[in-house]
């Protein structure tokens, strides 16, 4: 199942939708139990996910649904999760971290080899597809990175590795330059 968020220009609101092929189906028009925004959808946890997956399967099977599909090309796409409550970025590749530190005249951090290292990033600076606003004088200092982000959809504490998949709502392509 693919989920998107877009700006509904008619209602001037954010809208979450299921994407099937090149057509988007608004969640809350498919079923009144499904919320209109991605944040509300993720807060619904298992119940909203199960219901959305059922509608996704119905659409893919060719069954008629209540929501009128909209071509994705006609939508003003936002980031899939436009307003996450938190954004954490992990250092995953030693070679990349070492090169970045070396370029700044810094030694490699020993903690990298001892435990998973992450930092809190600015969750208020999330952008969807389109042009990136960058000051030209600083462009050469940016480190463009193609990453995959895991969207954690359910609350948890000290989650064991073998249970981690149960807390992931989905994945997003991300660039955190």
Where are each of the predicted segments found?
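Low-complexity, small/basic-enriched stretches
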Residues: 1-40
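Active-site microenvironments in enzyme catalytic cores
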Residues: 1-8, 19, 43-177
């Amino acid at each position: 199942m693919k989920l998107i968020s877009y700006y509904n220009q008619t209602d001037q609101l954010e809208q979450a939708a299921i994407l099937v092929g090149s057509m988007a189906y608004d969640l809350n028009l498919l079923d009144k139990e499904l919320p209109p925004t991605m944040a509300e959808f993720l807060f619904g946890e298992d119940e909203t996910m199960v219901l959305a997956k059922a509608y996704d399967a119905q659409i893919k099977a060719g069954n008629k649904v209540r929501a009128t599909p909209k071509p994705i090309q006609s939508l003003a796409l936002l980031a899939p999760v436009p307003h996450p409550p938190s954004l954490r970025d992990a250092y995953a590749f030693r070679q990349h971290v070492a090169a970045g530190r070396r370029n700044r005249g810094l030694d490699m951090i020993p903690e990298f080899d001892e435990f998973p290292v992450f930092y809190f990033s600015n969750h208020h600076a999330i952008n969807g597809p389109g042009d990136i606003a960058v000051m030209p004088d600083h462009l050469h200092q940016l480190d463009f990175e193609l990453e995959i982000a895991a969207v954690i959809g359910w609350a948890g504490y000290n989650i064991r590795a073998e249970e981690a998949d149960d807390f992931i709502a989905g994945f997003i392509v991300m660039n955190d330059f």
